[in-house]
A protein has these predicted regions:
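Active/ligand-binding-proximal structured segments within catalytic/core domains
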Residues: 34-49, 73-126, 367
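Functional cores that coordinate and move charged inorganic groups
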Residues: 86, 106-221
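A conserved active-site cap/scaffold subdomain adjacent to cofactor or substrate pockets
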Residues: 198, 203-258
Length: 397
């Protein structure tokens, strides 16, 4: 027996009665249900059947409700209720996702929707394509304009191969069966979707993008996180206060924060470049200490980038019978141990002894090894330990 899906005709129905049609352990099937089993990236509902908690809902032809510790029997009439506050939050989130992606796609038609995740804890979607805050700002303005316009949100069923379906956003490979449910937001968006939605955009009250996260790989997906309703309003107030405080700290006004930060970053980069230039000169002038036949070059520097430190270590290690121990300290300590090929010295062993002092990790080859750890408090001790290890190894020869 196929479950009658009450949420398809009335997504606002929160209480209903039904008859138990099947029981399998903790899982209960009903002849009809308002519990949405999840779909379109939206979480499944939670709620109660006869005051017993429904902890999970699974879809299919027959909707299954997980009700631990129940004693229901086939044929029993039951009263059920979904967690409406949770459901309505998810409905708002799902409609907001449709609205926001649609406005973003209008600005950049190359965007492709990859994945959706609408849960009580987090509402987001993933897109492939170029996304930046300028695009998001424009899309948000249009989306919130649609919310203010109180646009109707409707749905219709259509044949999978009908002309109507050809005009909507759809991933055909995800459609099972011959019918497609089309959800429309006014004339702004039409998309194939199995989720439950609000009836009018005014229920969203407000939409706010709170975070963009790009995949590390170039050209990877971008995660767009957002809030709706009161959560969006509260977050907007907090971010507004942060912006005002930041502007005050920068000696600027809120409208000029970005230009002030750009200037500050440029100034910081100039300072870093000056520091790198000074560091290169300082490291190049390092004089080796003679320990028998061994030449030992060592030094600790403030805020030198990894490449500069490694290049300098390589340069010194080109000289015969030379061991090198260099460190850069800032928020992290970076340590480099290198040696000329004519030395019987395993730089990895020396580095590991020094890393034990720092509590960090590292690796490399016999003639070149690097490691790092948070903090700078024990950087001097780590360098001293590396030098001690080198001395011990050559004193034994």
């Amino acid at each position: 027996m196929t479950t009658r899906l009450l949420y398809e005709t009335d997504p606002y129905l929160s209480k209903f009665d039904a008859t138990v049609t099947q029981v399998e352990g903790e899982w209960v099937e009903l002849d009809r249900t308002a519990f949405f089993p999840g779909g379109g990236g939206q979480d499944a509902d939670r709620g109660w059947i006869e005051d017993l908690e429904v902890t999970e809902v699974k879809g299919g032809d027959d909707i299954k409700h997980k009700v631990p510790d129940h004693a229901f029997t086939v044929g029993q009439r039951v009263e059920a209720e979904i967690d409406w506050e949770r459901r309505h939050d998810l409905m708002r989130g799902h409609t907001a996702e449709h609205l926001l992606f649609s406005t973003m796609h209008k600005i950049n038609p190359e965007l492709e929707l990859v994945k959706i995740s609408i849960t009580p804890e987090k509402k987001c979607f993933f897109v492939k394509g170029e996304v930046n805050w300028n695009l998001v700002s424009r899309a948000q303005q249009e989306a919130n304009g649609a919310i203010a316009a109180q646009l109707p949100v409707t749905h219709v069923w259509a044949s999978k191969d009908s002309e109507a379906v050809k005009q909507v956003r759809i991933k055909a490979e995800r459609i099972h069966g011959d019918k497609v449910r089309i959800v429309s937001i006014g004339e702004i968006d039409k998309a194939a979707c199995a989720g439950v939605h609000v009836q009018n955009t005014r229920e969203l009250r407000m939409l706010l993008v709170t975070k963009l996260t790009s995949a590390r790989a170039k050209g990877g997906d971008v995660e767009v996180e957002f809030l709706t309703g009161r959560d969006a309003m509260d977050k907007a107030l907090v971010l507004s206060a942060y912006a005002l405080q930041a502007a005050e700290s920068l000696g600027s006004v809120p409208d000029d924060i970005l230009s002030s930060l750009t200037n500050l970053k440029a100034e910081e980069e100039r300072s870093r470049e000056t520091l790198r230039s000074y560091a290169k000169e300082s490291i190049a002038r390092l004089q080796p200490v003679r320990l028998g036949d061994l030449h030992l070059v060592s030094g600790v520097f403030q805020g030198i980038d990894k490449k500069t430190l490694m290049d300098a270590a390589n340069e010194h290690a080109k000289k015969a019978k030379t061991a090198v121990v260099l460190a850069s300290v800032d928020e992290r300590t970076l340590l480099v141990v290198a040696s000329s090929p004519d030395l019987e010295l395993d730089c990895r062993e020396v580095l590991n002894s020094a890393m034990a002092v720092l509590g960090g990790k590292g690796g490399g080859s016999k003639c070149f090894a690097t490691g790092g750890a948070a903090g700078m408090e024990r950087s001097g001790q780590a360098v001293a330990k590396a030098i001690e290890e080198i001395k011990v190894r050559f004193a034994a020869k």
